[in-house]
């Protein structure tokens, strides 16, 4: 799945749960956790230069249950630093401040789990149980990146950015999740017919 979808899905779930105890910082923590493990692209050079260290590639070490948690913790810590969130706030003209605490890390890990589930549904597979196993798991329901899903997720992010009433934002989030599940259902149906 794409970067935008990995942010929108946990953010949407946490928003649509409509729990009073979840504020915008909590929902942002989930969304940031959803994208945190894709910053493994920074490790790409290691896996490219030293093929024996292939686990240091995109969809490598950070796409496991254990290292996903570690990555989420580091990511939430970094973006909770005033210099980092100050720069981001300045660039996008929105307050995206999150706090580094166990609640934020737990919600970020929820984002990681949604990310792992979405990537499990795509082609290529992910090493969920690394370092205990190098086996890559996949359901091959979605393509690695689906252009329609990417475009719709980006449109939802634009809607979230605009100063619209919360009910319209919730409608966009719900519609996106319905679309994502529907596409998955259609593809599962196609796979079953092919068997």
List the model feature ranges, each with a label.
Residues 1-195:
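N-terminal membrane-targeting hydrophobic helices
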């Amino acid at each position: 799945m794409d970067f935008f979808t990995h942010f929108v899905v946990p953010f949407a779930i946490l928003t649509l749960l409509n729990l009073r105890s979840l504020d915008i910082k909590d929902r942002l923590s989930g969304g940031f956790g959803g994208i945190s493990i894709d910053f493994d692209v920074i490790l790409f050079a290691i896996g490219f230069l030293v093929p024996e260290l292939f686990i240091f590639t995109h969809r490598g070490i950070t796409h496991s249950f254990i290292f996903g948690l570690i990555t989420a913790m580091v990511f939430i810590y970094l973006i909770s630093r005033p210099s980092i969130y100050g720069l981001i706030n300045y660039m996008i003209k929105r307050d995206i401040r999150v706090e580094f605490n166990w609640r934020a890390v737990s919600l970020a890990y929820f984002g990681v789990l949604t990310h792992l589930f979405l990537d499990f549904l795509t082609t290529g597979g992910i090493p969920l149980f690394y370092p205990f196993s190098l086996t890559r798991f996949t359901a091959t329901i979605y393509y690695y990146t689906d252009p329609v899903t990417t475009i719709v997720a980006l449109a939802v992010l634009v809607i979230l950015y605009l100063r619209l009433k919360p009910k319209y934002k919730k409608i966009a989030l719900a519609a996106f999740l319905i679309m994502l599940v529907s596409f998955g259902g259609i593809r599962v149906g196609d796979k079953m017919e092919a068997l």
